[in-house]
Amino acid sequence: VNFTTPLEWKSEAWWRNRSTAERLFHLHIPRRINDNMDKWKALDTAPDENLFLQGPSGSGKSLIAAKTLTTLIEDHKVSGRWVEADDYIEMIKDSFDNEGVLPEMYSSPHVVKYVKGVFDIVVIDGLGEERLTEFASHELGSLIRKRYDKQKTTIITSRLSIQDIKNRYGSRLANPLADFEHEVLRGKR
């Protein structure tokens, strides 16, 4: 079955009520991760539990996040999306350049709005790997804070500790992370 992403705005209920196969299709997990996650085990978590996965490069953070996301989508009637932190910043810039709507190269002109508050679960992969600018810090902080305030589940992967994140971005971004379930992964897997 070949699914397409709708160009017109869709509600939370619309995204939740798609088939499991369609909800998995719309996750947009990168192929390099999707092709390797079968070997990994999902974290035992509920669809309303925020997660912060910290560890060095190669420790399996992204694979565990992907496996956890897909398992939650398969086991519950929830919607989700995968987004790299640096790609999210590019999406925001592109939406500013196009009057709030993303150009055709993106899966949906509304993906930024969906990530901010429509999708039930969002993985933000590689927090701290993007080029640090005031703009990036503000936008990532805004995303995490909005999702936190709306009680939307967020799974974050980072090489940085919460203290490093606080030092890099400030408490606006770091404070919500104190309520996240925190997993520290050690070394290469």
Predicted ranges, named:
Residues 40, 114-115, 176-177:
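A generic structural signal for nonpolar/aromatic side chains embedded in well-ordered alpha-helices
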Residues 52-54, 80-84, 156:
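A structural signal for short, well-ordered beta-strand segments and their strand-loop junctions
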Residues 1-43, 181-183:
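A short, basic N-terminal segment
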